[in-house]
Amino acid sequence: FNRQPSNSSTGELDKEALSFNKDTYYVGFDANQGAELQGQMVLDYIKANAATIDRNGDGVIGYVLAIGDIGHNDSIARTRGVRSALGTGVDANGAVDSTPAGTNVDGSAKVVQDAKLDVGGKTYTIRELASQEMKNSAGATWDAATAGNAIGTWTASFGDQIDVVVSNNDGMGMSMFNAWAKDNKVPTFGYDANSDAVAAIAEGYGGTISQHADVQAYLTLRVLRNALDGVDVDTGIGTADEAGNCLTEGEDYRYSEEERSYYALNVAVTAENYQDFTDSTKVYDKVSKQLDSSKSPTKKVWLDIYNASDNFLSSTYQPLLENYDDLLNLKVDYIGGDGQTESNITNRLG
């Protein structure tokens, strides 16, 4: 769950891993759909605020981009989604290049391009001023502290040119927002709909994407529960169980048989609807009913959280898992990793 088996360079699915046995499935969210939503959210904001968003009036709407992990398929998709929507992406082997641009104040980088946007009879240039992978010295990616340091470096050099801040997730986005963007009234866009980011929308955070973590967490444990019970994998998902738990395909999730993957569908969270997302750890009402312990007896499960320091995984995903495990009669041992080495988790198996 959460990180789909894939090629770290291309993002191509590892179908061999996904077909390990009959009970192997992936649970996550629709990365491409969410990435497109984030990109469109940023573009819509720029169009709606074009007259005021160009802070120094140079006709260039400049943005900086915090990239979580250059080898992570979700990070790749989000970088591509933003660049595609804004028109700054360039083709690389049939897909938008997701390579960090480094510093690109003069627009000379090869992995991105300047785009043109016509709004209200005026033509603006959109430029990715800088982007980098937020990896710390210990090797941990999606690192919020590194993002906070990066925005400090960027603003010291070309702060008056930064009109928008974009991040592959809210952890990094909030770090940059709190370090600089909030005080300078620069809209910041993230991903995950973490509770602090949703609350910050009232203070100028531009928006975020809810990856329907409540549905993801349920699906993660439900697939496990069904495998342990030896019932059809769709039980309690697309087909109601005896308690009445059931999701709506096409609205709450989609299933790809070819990819053996369940994907929660994403929702854009902006100033118009953020109050509906203030409690990120609330179970989804459609699948909130307790299973009968006589038919689904308590089972012990070992579940690893590969990066326990990640804001989304620790503050949203794991609490949701913990809220669902009792409903599904699962006794779960949650093992937190460091986001760097597999042995940090596997060494605990003995």
PLM feature spans:
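A residue-level marker of the well-folded mature domains of exported/periplasmic proteins
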Residues: F1-G350
